[in-house]
């Protein structure tokens, strides 16, 4: 799997304009929609239990994000996820803050038990808590811990029968057999709320057009990281507000050629 092959997935997303159904959180809804539009995907945010199953059935991908967790949204996620499974629509799950509270952890473990996932994406602490491994977490954005990230990712992929994506200073993608580390990105992403949540939805757009989910995730993470690097280079003296605007620009403007030039991946 070379960089040229990976970079072509970006062009495929833009040519296909996939519909990505998001059941996401109130903090990031606008940013997620704008990010997907900038990339070239078509976002829809449908939450009502009366329509989520139908909407999920016609989407290219379904993204479930439990950032601002409420019981009615959990019900909607389960309805949408089961419909997606029946209709062969890939489901991505972002277990935001798993481990922070008992309710949040319970939901984070219940959803993968009920729904077949194409991708689970979170920081190391979140993924560890989904599979009931001890890992310290403080708040929904915490990711620091003392475990082995690659080991946790492989364990999650095996136990949940999915592709596990753990993001941090470096990003890990694995299906339990193939394991790749992506080394693109920029620390200023942590200063803008919703960049992780948007990333999961961007992976959804890539998964909608590339059925090798490992390849799709690698392509999405590399694209996202390169776009962040290019945006940071243009706004380094200005701060996170300017970065956020420029990042949306780079989601629209970063090309497959940029990915070939700047992408950094390592197979381990």
From Swiss-Prot:
Substrate binds at residues 45, 194. The keyword 4Fe-4S does not apply. It catalyses: 5-(2-hydroxyethyl)-4-methylthiazole + ATP = 4-methyl-5-(2-phosphooxyethyl)-thiazole + ADP + H(+). Its EC number is 2.7.1.50. GO terms for molecular function: ATP binding; hydroxyethylthiazole kinase activity; magnesium ion binding. SUPFAM superfamilies: Ribokinase-like (SSF53613). ATP binds at residues 121, 167. Its cofactor is Mg(2+). Pfam families: HK. Pathway: Cofactor biosynthesis; thiamine diphosphate biosynthesis; 4-methyl-5-(2-phosphoethyl)-thiazole from 5-(2-hydroxyethyl)-4-methylthiazole: step 1/1. Keywords: ATP-binding, Kinase, Magnesium, Metal-binding, Nucleotide-binding, Thiamine biosynthesis, Transferase. GO terms for biological process: thiamine biosynthetic process; thiamine diphosphate biosynthetic process. It comes from the Bacteria. The keyword ATP-binding applies. Belongs to the Thz kinase family. Catalyzes the phosphorylation of the hydroxyl group of 4-methyl-5-beta-hydroxyethylthiazole (THZ). This is Hydroxyethylthiazole kinase. It comes from Bacillus cereus (strain ATCC 10987 / NRS 248).
């Amino acid at each position: 799997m070379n960089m040229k092959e990976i970079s072509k997935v970006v062009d495929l997303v833009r040519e296909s304009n996939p519909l990505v159904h998001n059941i996401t959180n109130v903090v990031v809804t606008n940013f997620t929609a704008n990010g997907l539009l900038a990339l070239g995907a078509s976002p829809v945010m449908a939450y009502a239990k009366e329509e989520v199953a139908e909407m999920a059935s016609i989407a290219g991908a379904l993204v479930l994000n439990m950032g601002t967790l409420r019981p009615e949204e959990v019900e909607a996620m389960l309805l949408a996820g089961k419909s997606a499974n029946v209709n062969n629509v890939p489901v991505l799950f972002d277990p935001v803050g798993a481990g922070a509270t008992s309710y949040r952890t319970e939901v984070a473990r219940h959803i993968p038990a009920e729904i077949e996932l194409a991708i689970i994406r979170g920081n190391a602490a979140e993924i560890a808590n989904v599979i009931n491994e001890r890992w310290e977490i403080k708040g929904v954005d915490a990711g620091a811990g003392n475990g082995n990230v690659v080991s946790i990712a492989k364990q999650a992929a095996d136990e949940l029968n999915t592709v596990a994506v753990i993001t941090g200073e470096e990003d890990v993608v694995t299906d339990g057999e193939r394991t790749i580390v992506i080394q693109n990105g920029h620390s200023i992403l942590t200063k803008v709320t919703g960049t992780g949540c948007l990333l999961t939805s961007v992976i959804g757009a890539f998964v909608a057009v590339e059925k090798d989910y490992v390849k799709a995730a690698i392509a999405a993470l590399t694209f996202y990281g390169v776009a962040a690097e290019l945006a940071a280079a243009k706004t380094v003296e200005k701060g996170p507000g300017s970065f956020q605007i420029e990042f949306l620009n780079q989601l629209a403007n970063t090309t497959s050629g940029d990915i070939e030039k700047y992408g950094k991946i390592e197979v381990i």
